[in-house]
Swiss-Prot record:
Biased segments, Low complexity type: 845-856
UniProt name for this protein: Metabotropic glycine receptor
Positions of crosslink type Glycyl lysine isopeptide (Lys-Gly) (interchain with G-Cter in ubiquitin): 774
Extracellular membrane side: 25-417, 475-478, 548-576, 634-642
GO molecular function, one term: G protein-coupled glycine receptor activity
A cellular component annotation (GO) from this entry: postsynaptic membrane
Residue ranges that the UniProt entry lists as topological domain Cytoplasmic: 440-451, 502-525, 598-611, 665-1200
PROSITE patterns: G_PROTEIN_RECEP_F3_4
Positions occupied by motif VCPWE motif 3: 1165-1169
Bilayer-spanning residue ranges: 418-439, 452-474, 479-501, 526-547, 577-597, 612-633, 643-664
Length: 1200
């Protein structure tokens, strides 16, 4: 019967627990009460508020959170063994302590769990006690229970106490007291207790010993504390409706009840058993239950309590409520308190963790909790009881985390960085000063050879390339990291884009394999191409910057942290994939530059600028490759000082070296005399190249350096170009000299048509002409040479040798030509000699060219005399660009500068000079033909043949020592010339007295104005890139040898071995001057008959002017040597007696033009030049106008 009652009671208790949980969920504490219950409940709360505000003596915990108070109380009030057990949890020390009663931890700081949320491990026991109390309240408040006695319900109470231990394992003991009279008897009538002993539950009835509960002690506080305040804090869930209504309310679970707040908590305590403390801390939870009187007034009936073991309950000293709450010793300003779980009911189960930016002075102490060992005895001193103060020290500045006082960030070397930035600022200042210096010397040849705008652009880009070092001096930021890419890429594109485009321009202009003019790349065009490159780089940088800004919105930072091998951190600009792409782009661009350097390696240039640019590009490629490799591999481990030095070294090994390679040679050459380089190399200056033909010179050299081309093709191309240059020269001459158009010629239109036909010669005809020159030189050269030299001393025995001379002159003029600009001054001769093989067109062409040449004779002689004083170096073989540079200093002469370095031009000049000599001899022989015998001419011819036979073998002997000088640089020697013949001046005076040239040729008055007196030239160097003397001028050399043989007393043969005389370099120069003097003397002594000039000497007059017209195309200083001049004078005297003027004159004039056809009379071409016979003075002036003008300009010649 008892077992069934226990089981039934347990089932009812479980059911009540379930219904109570449902009721609690349906009626939460915060739900507003009904209007009927609001007033009395307000009174109950009004009565409870003063109690809550007053200190409750039953609560042993203070709200103080000071850990020092806890340590002091533990040292002063708590026994040593108990305190040691509280800190260590070692029960062996507790057994050695003696006791007379239980020990409670009362009056210690902390909050009671009853006033706040308790420990989670106590929630089960608390809920079990609350539901059991509410079950008793409902049982005692029913009608039936009120009629029954306590003895009848004893079994039910025993079953209830037993069920508490079985339902919650944390409860070690449960008890219930019951009294029928609430206040009349101090002790309860029933006292039932159930105890857990190992695996079984012991149920005891202690009603007989319940009288000890009447005494108020610490052990009975759980009963007397609830009895003293018998009015419970409970509320009626239903209205008072009498017994019937109460039963109805029971069925509706209405009535008086309690919750967790009605449970009383005792402080932790130790039980004393047999004079010693029982191991294990306990806490008692108690709650009262009430019944109803007959008048339905609540009355106290009893108390139910449970004892809970705390050995598995952790003390949280870091929390704000609970036992020992807030008693930690962590400094909240630099550390955080973190509880340690699973240690049980012991103190100090926490650790102080240093906050970010702080560290503990002892590296191996991570917290201030130290579990004491079992053999450790609590001494009772404050030092041992209290927990050691956990102090966290701040880290070094800038360190978010640290373990000790060592710096976590890399310490920068301030002095090193200051020295680097100072030197970098100095270099940037020097770069800016260099821009000003280059602009100041913008008119210098060295600066103009490279281009002022391009040099300034390179220097400006260098400033941008210097900026990354300045940016890295400061702390990295997002803006500085973006600016770093902008400065690097824009500077690289500007500097090396300009250098590469300059090399590209050299490749385009100098390495053209055709003689056709290509579009010239001026500085403006190069800048436009550079603008395209810079625009592409700028567009990429804009896109990259916008993507970086978008990444910042996605929390993708551009600035990160690196760590060195010493575990020191530093801020750095992160490297992304775009940096790799830009490095590859730089590498490919530099490879293109290296290809251009290889392509232009054979191109000569003033100051060797392409060579220095090639060195700069190769240097940039190598240094940049090393720089990017180190940067990409070691960037995250390279500290800022090393990174700054890396950028510094990269900037100066590339940018500074490039600036030095471009500027230092220019200013170093400016102090020396660069004529050697100017003579052998071509300028790259955009100004000169736009006006000169030196680019063709370089293209010819490059073409000859590649032997894959056929010389015949090059010769054909040159012939076409010469014809085009002749037209250009004539147009420019007429444009700059409008007065030349006043003297019109009836054959002018015919001459223009012939010149147009010359320029349109097909390629096949040109090749046929060149082949005929090689195959049929015996016919043309022998005949032309014989006509030239029909004088007693040179005419015989010269038919074979001139053929070889003509062939050599043609070949060497092509091989050794260094500038096609030289031929611009001599296009009249070249263009007239192009169609020589066409026998039918020669007469018409020569007449047209003679008419044009006769108009410009005086004008050319005046310009040649002026050029003699303005050009510092006579016959300097320098590039056309250098001539343009020198000619720009003399803007008053709108003419082409003097050039003479091509051997082909030198050879043609020699032949024209000999033709002029023949013309002069013709005038002399005309007056002496009547008195001369024919046999004398035969005698002189034999003498000439014998002389030439002796000269030819000696020419081979003289050729050998002169071969090493074929392409070398020869120094011009100063040669003194004899003074002018007084007969010439007398002849000129006589001519001026006889007639007034203004009356006959008023358009030539301006041309007869004598030019400035040429100053004596200094001994200067010039370049002669030519073959030996015999190869370039064999006829002149033979004549010179013959003269040396006949005039051995003068000692000129020995002088030629000691030093190179001017007669060897330019043997035609002195000869021309002597011929002009003899011509003037003959003009003054020999009268001209008008009738004879019309009838017999018509062709002779034309020939004389024709030769003079051709002579205007020669440079002013191309004259015959003195030795040959004297020889010609002797031959002229003999020719007066032996030769016939009618037979000699055509040959002498045609020899210079290689022509064999009869010429048109001058009277037919220019009939207005011949006046009636009644004007002898005018007729005389018309006969030799060119000779008169030539004599007038040649009398005040320079003394050399």
């Amino acid at each position: 019967m008892g077992a069934m009652a226990y089981s039934l009671l347990f089932c009812l208790l479980l059911a009540h627990l379930g219904l109570g949980e449902v009721g609690a969920s349906l009626d939460p504490p915060g739900r507003p009460d009904s209007p009927r219950e609001r007033t009395p409940r307000g009174k109950q709360h009004g009565q409870q508020l003063p109690r809550a505000s007053a200190p409750d003596p039953s609560i042993p915990w203070s709200r103080s959170t000071d850990g020092t108070i806890l340590a002091q109380k533990l040292a002063e009030e708590v026994p040593v063994d108990v305190a040691s057990y509280l800190y260590t949890g070692d029960f062996h020390q507790l057994k050695r302590a003696n006791c007379s009663g239980r020990y409670e931890l009362a009056g210690l700081p902390g909050k009671s769990p009853s006033l706040a949320s308790s420990h989670p491990s106590l929630h089960g026991a608390l809920d079990t006690l609350t539901h059991a109390t509410n079950f008793l309240n409902m049982m005692l408040q029913s009608n039936k229970s009120r009629e029954q006695t306590v003895q009848d319900d004893l079994q039910w109470y025993q079953a209830l106490v037993r069920s508490l231990l079985e339902g919650e394992p944390s409860i070690s003991r449960a008890a219930i007291t019951f009294s029928t009279e609430s206040l009349s008897t101090p002790a309860p009538q029933v006292f039932l207790q159930a105890t857990r002993e190992e695996s079984r539950i012991l149920l005891q009835d202690l009603s007989s010993s319940a009288h000890h509960l009447a005494n108020a002690t610490l052990e009975t506080e759980w009963f007397h504390g609830l009895r003293r305040k018998w009015r419970p804090h409970l509320h009626r869930r239903g209205s008072n409706q009498g017994p019937r209504g109460l039963g109805h309310s029971w069925r509706r679970r209405d009535g008086l009840g309690g919750d967790r707040s009605h449970v009383k908590w005792s402080p932790p305590y130790l039980e004393c058993e047999n004079g010693s403390y029982k191991p294990g801390w306990l806490v008692t939870l108690s709650a009262a239950f009430y019944g109803l009187q007959p008048n339905l007034v609540p009355e106290f009936r009893g108390v139910m309590k449970v004892d809970i073991s705390l050995q598995k309950v952790d003390i949280d000293q870091c929390s704000s409520d609970g036992w020992f709450s807030g008693t930690h010793k962590c400094h909240l300003n630099n550390s955080e308190c973190m509880p340690i779980k699973g240690l049980g009911f012991v103190l100090g189960a926490y650790q102080c963790i240093c906050k970010a930016g702080f560290y503990h002075p002892r590296v191996f102490s991570v917290n201030n909790f130290q579990r004491r060992g079992p053999d450790h005895h609590f001494s009772g001193s404050t030092k041992d009881v209290s927990e050691e103060t956990h102090v966290c020290l701040p880290c070094r500045e800038g360190c978010p985390f640290c373990a000790d006082d060592r710096p976590c960030f890399v310490q920068e070397d301030k002095y090193l960085r200051l020295a680097i930035i100072s030197f970098q600022a100095l270099c940037m200042l020097l770069d800016f000063v260099s821009m000003l210096v280059v602009y100041h010397f913008r008119k210098a040849k060295s600066i103009r050879a490279s281009g002022l705008i391009l040099l300034e652009t390179i220097l400006f880009g260098s400033l941008l390339l210097y900026f990354p070092v300045v940016i890295l001096y400061f702390e990295p930021s997002t803006f500085r990291c973006i600016l770093l890419r902008w400065a690097r890429l824009l500077g690289f594109a500007t500097v090396y884009g300009t250098v590469t485009l300059k090399l590209h321009r050299v490749l385009k202009v100098f390495l053209s394999r055709t003689a056709q003019r290509i579009p010239y790349m001026t500085g403006g065009r190069v800048m436009r191409m550079l603008a395209v490159i810079v625009l592409v780089v700028f567009w990429f940088l804009v896109g990259w910057t916008s993507s970086m800004c978008q990444n910042l919105e996605r929390d993708i930072l551009l600035v990160g942290q690196g760590q060195t091998s010493d575990h020191l951190t530093f801020n750095m600009c992160l490297i992304d994939r775009w940096d790799y792409m830009t490095a590859v782009a730089e590498f490919l661009f530099l490879l293109w530059g290296i290809y251009l350097c290889y392509a232009v390696r054979t191109v000569p240039s003033a100051f060797h600028e392409p060579r220095y640019m090639a060195v700069a590009v190769h240097n940039e490629l190598i240094i940049t490759a090393i720089f990017h490799t180190i940067r990409f591999v070691l960037a995250s481990r390279l500290q800022p000082d090393w990174m700054l030095m890396l950028y510094f070294a990269h900037a100066h090994l590339t940018v500074t070296v490039t600036i030095g390679l471009l500027l230092i040679p220019k200013f170093s050459h400016s102090s020396n005399n660069p004529r050697d380089d100017i003579a052998t190399e071509a300028y790259e200056d955009e100004l000169d190249m736009g006006r000169s033909g030196s680019y063709l010179n370089s293209s010819i050299n490059s073409a000859w350096s590649e032997h894959s081309l056929d010389p015949e093709d090059i010769r054909d191309e040159l012939k076409k170009l010469y014809a085009q240059l002749e037209i250009y020269k004539r147009k420019k001459m007429i444009t700059n000299n409008p007065h030349l158009q006043k003297k019109r010629c009836s054959k002018k239109g015919l001459g223009r048509s012939i010149m147009r036909r010359i320029t349109e010669i097909p390629e096949t005809v040109s090749r046929q002409c060149s082949k005929e020159d090689k195959e049929g030189t015996d016919h043309s050269a022998a005949k032309g040479t014989g006509l030239v030299r029909k004088n007693p001393t040179e005419s015989s025995g010269n038919t074979g040798r001139p053929k070889e001379e003509s062939l050599k002159n043609r070949v060497f003029s092509l091989k050794k030509s260094h500038s096609t600009y030289d031929h611009v001054r001599d296009q009249t001769v070249e263009s007239s000699s192009l169609p020589m093989e066409s026998q039918e067109e020669e007469a018409t062409e020569n007449s047209t060219l003679e008419s044009l040449s006769s108009k410009k004779l005086t004008q050319k002689l005046k310009e040649d005399s002026e050029a003699e004083s303005t050009e510092s170096v006579p016959l300097v073989c320098k590039s056309a660009s250098a001539h343009n540079l020198s000619s720009e200093k003399k803007p008053g002469h709108p003419r082409t500068s003097m050039l003479q370095k091509s051997l082909s031009v030198i050879a043609s000049a020699k032949e024209k000079t000999l033709g002029l000599a023949g013309k002069t001899q013709t005038l002399v022989m005309e007056d002496r033909a009547k008195s001369q015998k024919p046999k004398d001419r035969e005698t002189i011819r034999k003498y000439s043949n014998s002389d030439n036979v002796e000269t030819i073998p000696n020419s081979g002997h003289m050729e050998e020592p002169r071969k090493p000088q074929k392409s070398g640089i020869m120094k011009q020697q100063r040669v003194s010339l004899p003074t002018a013949n007084p007969d010439v001046s007398s002849g000129i005076t006589q001519i001026k007295d006889n007639f007034d040239i203004g009356e006959v040729c008023p358009w030539e008055v301006y041309d007869l104005t004598p030019g400035p007196m040429p100053s004596e030239p200094k001994a200067q160097k010039h370049v002669s890139i030519a073959a030996s003397e015999v190869e370039q001028n064999p006829a002149s050399f033979l004549k010179e040898k013959s003269y040396h043989k006949s005039k051995a007393t003068e000692g000129l043969y020995q002088a030629n071995h000691k030093s190179i005389d001017k007669t060897e370099v330019c043997p035609w120069e002195i000869h021309s001057q002597s011929l002009l003097e003899d011509e003037n003397r003959l003009i003054s002594k020999t009268p001209v008959l008008p009738g004879r000039a019309r009838e017999e000497n018509g062709s002779q007059l034309y020939t004389t002017n024709m030769c003079a017209g051709q002579y205007e195309e020669l440079p002013h200083k191309v004259v015959a040597p003195k030795v040959e001049n004297e020889n010609l004078n002797q031959m002229g005297d003999q020719e007066k007696q032996t030769s016939s003027s009618v037979d000699i004159i055509p040959g002498s004039c045609n020899s210079s033009n290689n022509s064999h056809q009869p010429l048109t009379s001058r009277a037919e071409v220019c009939p207005w030049e011949f006046e009636p016979l009644e004007q002898p003075n005018a007729e005389r002036s018309v006969t030799l106008p060119a000779s008169s003008a030539l004599s007038a300009n040649k009398i005040p010649g320079p003394q050399k």
